[in-house]
C-alpha cells in the first residue's frame, strides 16, 4: 500500500494505492498473461472523487506492461468514466464507454537510462502520455523517507494538460510529482522499509 498527499489550488488531495487480491487475464500475441490490478482511490478534502483500476504485468526481464485503466469519477454526482481504456474485449464489470486499445502500452524498462522514452498511455484522443527520463541516480526526500537511485521523468501529453515531472524509486514506483500549482509526495508506504533496507545494503 502507498499513500500520497497532493496539494492543489489550496486543497488537500489524498491518494491511496493498493494491489487487489484478484488478477485479470489479457492476451499478448496469443499468450495469456495474468495481471495484478493496482487500484488508486482519490479523496479531495475528505470526499471520494475517483477510483481507477490499472492491470499491470512484469516480464521476466523486468519490463513493466500496462494493459488498461478503468475510471470511476464521483465528483458532481458520479457516473463519469472518462479516460477508461483497455486492451482486448471488455468484461461486464468494465465501464460501458471503455475504449479499446490495439496493444499493451507502458513498456517501462527494468533499468531506465538517461534519455529513454516510453508511453504508458497511447490512445489519443482518449488518453495520451509520453515519458522521458531526464535524470538518474538521484536521492529524493519525501515524508515517507529518503530514497536513493531514483529517476526523474518528464510526462507530456498531446491532450492539453501541463507537463508533469515525476520521481520514481526502484521497488516502490512514483514517490513525488510536480506541475505548476500542484505537488504530490509519498507520505506512507509498505514498500518504504524495503527501500531503506536496500539502501543500507548498498552502503555496506
Regions found by a protein language model. Give the residues of each.
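Conserved functional acidic sites
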Residues: 1-204
Amino acid at each position: 500500500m502507498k499513500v500520497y498527499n497532493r496539494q492543489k489550488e489550496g486543497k488537500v488531495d489524498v491518494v491511496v494505492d493498493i494491489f487487489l487480491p484478484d488478477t485479470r487475464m489479457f492476451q499478448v500475441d496469443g499468450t495469456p498473461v495474468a495481471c495484478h490490478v493496482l487500484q488508486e482511490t482519490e479523496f479531495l478534502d475528505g470526499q471520494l472523487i475517483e477510483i481507477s483500476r490499472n492491470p499491470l504485468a512484469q516480464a521476466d526481464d523486468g519490463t513493466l506492461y500496462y494493459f488498461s485503466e478503468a475510471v470511476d469519477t464521483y465528483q458532481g454526482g458520479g457516473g463519469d468514466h472518462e479516460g477508461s481504456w483497455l486492451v482486448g474485449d471488455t468484461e461486464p464489470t468494465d465501464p460501458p464507454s471503455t475504449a479499446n486499445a490495439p496493444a499493451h502500452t507502458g513498456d517501462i524498462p527494468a533499468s531506465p537510462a538517461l534519455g529513454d522514452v516510453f508511453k504508458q498511455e497511447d490512445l489519443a484522443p482518449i488518453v495520451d502520455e509520453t515519458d522521458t527520463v531526464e535524470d538518474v541516480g538521484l536521492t529524493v526526500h519525501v515524508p515517507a523517507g529518503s530514497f536513493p537511485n531514483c529517476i526523474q521523468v518528464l510526462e507530456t501529453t498531446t491532450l492539453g494538460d501541463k507537463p508533469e515531472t515525476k520521481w520514481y524509486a526502484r521497488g516502490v514506483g512514483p514517490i513525488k510529482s510536480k506541475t505548476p500549482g500542484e505537488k504530490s509526495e509519498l507520505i506512507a508506504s509498505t514498500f518504504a522499509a524495503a527501500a531503506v533496507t536496500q539502501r543500507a545494503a548498498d552502503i555496506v
